[in-house]
Amino acid sequence: MVPRVWSLMRFLIKGSVAGGAIYLVYDQDPLGPSDKSQAALQKAEEVVPPAVYQFSQYVCEQTGLKIPQLPAPPKFNFHIRDYWNSGVIKVMSALSVAPSKAREYSKEGWEYLKERTK
C-alpha cells in the first residue's frame, strides 16, 4: 500500500511541477517577442532570490539545519534581443553548408588515400 501511495505522490508532484512550468510559459510568454522575454527575465531576477532565501529559512526552521548563504546571482549585462535565435541561426547556417563541406572533406580524404596507396 505504501509504495502505491508514494508513487502516486511522486506522480502528483511531477505533474504539478510540469503544469506550473507550462502555465508559467503560457502566462509570461518568454518564448515570444524579445521585449516580453526581457521583462520576464527582469521579473524573475527580482522575485526568485527572495523566494529562495525565504524557502531556505523555512527549511532551516523546520529541520534545524544551517544552510550557508548562497552567493548573489550573476548579473547579465546584455539584451536578449541581441542574441535571440542566434543559436538557431548558427545551426541553420551550418546545416546549409554541410553538403558542400562534406563533399570537400570527402574529396580531400579520397585524394589522401590515393596518395598513400601509391
UniProtKB/Swiss-Prot annotation:
Keywords: Membrane, Mitochondrion, Mitochondrion inner membrane, Transmembrane, Transmembrane helix. Residues 1-7 are mitochondrial matrix. It comes from the Eukaryota. InterPro entries: Mic13 (IPR026769). It is a single-pass membrane protein. The chain crosses the membrane at residues 8-26. GO terms for biological process: cristae formation. Its main location: mitochondrion. Residues 27-118 are mitochondrial intermembrane. It is found in: Mitochondrion inner membrane. One of its GO terms (cellular component) is MICOS complex. Belongs to the MICOS complex subunit Mic13 family. Component of the MICOS complex, a large protein complex of the mitochondrial inner membrane that plays crucial roles in the maintenance of crista junctions, inner membrane architecture, and formation of contact sites to the outer membrane. Constituent of mature MICOS complex, it is required for the formation of cristae junction (CJ) and maintenance of cristae morphology. Required for the incorporation of MICOS10/MIC10 into the MICOS complex. Component of the mitochondrial contact site and cristae organizing system (MICOS) complex, composed of at least MICOS10/MIC10, CHCHD3/MIC19, CHCHD6/MIC25, APOO/MIC26, MICOS13/MIC13, APOOL/MIC27 and IMMT/MIC60. The MICOS complex associates with mitochondrial outer membrane proteins SAMM50, MTX1 and MTX2 (together described as components of the mitochondrial outer membrane sorting assembly machinery (SAM) complex) and DNAJC11, mitochondrial inner membrane protein TMEM11 and with HSPA9. This is MICOS complex subunit MIC13. It comes from Sus scrofa.
